[in-house]
A protein has these predicted regions:
Chain A
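Positively charged n-region of N-terminal signal peptides that target proteins for export
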Residues: 1-4
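Bacterial N-terminal signal peptides
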Residues: 8-16
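Short sequence/structural segments immediately N-terminal
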Residues: 20-251
Length: 251, 261
């Protein structure tokens, strides 16, 4: 009798586990309005400080600079509020202050406070309309940023610290087998990523460099914001666009 | 009894897998420039009711070569591996070779005077608000910059004479004749698209001599040590220094520097 109840207990746990995985697999996070996709609220110190929290728009910055510039050269972390940005650091020319110094971009003077410290009620909607000439894609910002870059419609700088910077040419295309039998495999183009990112943005923290040696790399964790999900949930094109990674999938 | 153990085991596996999953697939926090190369040594400290030691590589490497501590003084290359005791230091081993009241501060009883316990905190400093005598950012402000780690190009700083490295400690080191270092050589990158590596013996020898790497980390016969980049990221081979103290291997092109074919 004890054995049967134990078996029941274990199988119930297993069913629960599978159900959990399945709901997470199909439960994509809701998408905001295209103009709001990639917007980040930085409220690390709200409550302690008198200034309202900061809203940051990825779409208005990535037309000018690649991801590499901020997330590598300026050392912004890949998660909201994880970077210890302070007003003092900005004024010293770190983080936002590297550009927002009154020369490259508006500075840290009183009339501009509200440009960033605005509780997310910012003007990104208006700025977003300026991007209406960029190629369309169905999800996220509804902008095909890759195509915009390749066709020269935007020319983001890949470095602000080194004028002679040349990214390494690395074009290897990886074929990734899907874990589920009926799902066609995914493709990973290094070259498309290299145009925006530095090797060190992904390696070795997020992905090992040795093929097939990254553990727990599956959709469940990607949907939790790990692996590809570090970018492809909130900033780069979202996971709703299955066929962009799994080319043989419809939809 | 057996069954309840099994249930416990299954539950434990669930917990472990969910905790483990937290640590993978995300970007780690990069240490601040002044934290890079800091090592916490806590073999015996907490057990004895004292704060663990925080050792700053940047402060020491601005005065001494790596070789002096890691070869002549016998410090291991991994935190906690050396098993340093207070008694060792007082006998002039390890830290005590310099921290003896002559070369640098000490807590030892000197000439029958009371020991200066105010110095304890200067090393046993974890969790304490200790203001160092040399402030990192002030110290490195005119140094050539690099992209990672301490954000200091230590190699260039040494070449420019901004820091002068001492490679000899009286009573510990033994002077030998100079050796001519082998010339730079190329190491083939395993992956076709990666530029090959140029390894400079000379640049390394300024800091490390020969003994720090040979023969334990690298055999001396060319191409006989088989290693790959993942092993380096895991702290082996070049990763024994590059990633925790010397510039990090995330800066690909610093080593993969040949012309692209």
């Amino acid at each position: 009798m004890k054995r049967i109840s134990l078996l029941l207990c274990v199988s119930a746990l297993a069913v629960y586990g599978v159900a959990l995985a399945a709901t997470q697999f199909f439960d994509l996070p809701p998408l905001p309005h295209p103009s709001q996709y990639g917007n980040v609220l930085i409220d690390r110190q709200t409550g302690e400080m008198t200034m309202p929290s900061v809203s940051f728009s990825h779409s208005s910055h990535r037309t000018r600079y690649t991801c590499r510039v901020c997330h590598f050269e300026l050392e912004f972390m890949m998660q909201a509020n994880a970077t210890e940005i302070t007003e003092q650091a900005n004024r010293k020319g770190e983080y936002c202050g590297k550009c927002h110094n009154g020369e490259l971009a508006f500075g840290h003077t009183e009339e501009y406070c509200v440009y960033c410290h605005n509780f997310g009620m910012d003007g990104s909607q208006k700025r977003f309309e300026e991007l209406s000439n960029l190629p369309w894609e169905p999800y996220g910002n509804e902008i095909d940023w890759d195509l915009a870059l390749e066709s020269g419609l935007i020319k983001p700088k890949a470095s602000i610290l080194d004028d002679d910077f040349q990214p390494m040419e690395f074009t290897s295309m990886l074929e990734l087998d899907a874990d589920w039998g009926l799902i066609p495999g995914a493709e990973f183009p290094h070259d498309k990523h290299q145009k925006w990112l530095d090797c060190a943005n992904c390696h070795p923290d997020i992905f090992n460099i040795k093929k097939k040696s990254t553990k727990h790399f599956d959709m469940k964790y990607i949907l939790e914001g790990k692996y590809c999900g570090v970018c492809h949930l909130k900033v780069a094109f979202p996971l709703d666009n299955c066929s962009r990674c799994h080319p043989k999938m419809s939809g | 009894m057996k069954q309840s153990r099994l249930v416990l085991f299954v539950l434990l596996m669930f917990c472990v897998s969910s905790v483990f999953a937290q640590a993978v697939g995300t970007k780690k926090r990069a240490p601040k420039p002044d934290e890079y190369g800091n090592v916490v040594i806590n073999n015996y400290s907490e057990e004895a009711g004292i704060s663990p030691v925080v050792f700053s590589h940047w402060l020491h490497r601005s005065m001494y070569t790596c070789r002096l501590c890691h070869v002549d003084l016998g410090f291991a290359m991994e935190a906690g591996e050396t098993l340093i005791r207070e008694e060792d230091n007082r006998n002039g081993l390890y830290c005590g070779a310099c921290h003896n009241g002559k070369k640098s501060f000490t807590t030892k009883v000197l000439d029958g005077k009371e020991p200066d316990n105010s110095n304890c905190d200067r090393c046993h400093s974890q969790g304490k608000d200790i203001v160092p005598q040399k402030e990192f950012y002030e110290f490195v402000k005119d140094f050539p910059r690099s992209r990672f780690g301490n954000r200091v190009d230590w190699l260039k700083a040494e070449e420019l004479g901004l820091i002068k490295l001492n490679d000899y400690l009286k009573g510990v080191s033994i002077k030998r004749g100079e050796l001519k270092y082998p010339s730079d050589f190329e190491i083939d990158a395993k992956f076709n698209e990666m530029p090959d590596i140029i390894f400079s013996h000379e640049k390394h020898a300024v800091w490390n001599g020969c003994e720090l790497c040979h023969p334990q980390i690298f055999s001396i016969k060319k191409a006989s040590t088989v290693f790959d980049m993942q092993a380096i990221f895991d702290g082996k081979y070049c990763g024994a220094c590059h990633g925790s103290v010397a510039f990090t291997p995330m800066d690909c092109q610093l080593c993969h520097s040949t012309e692209i074919k």
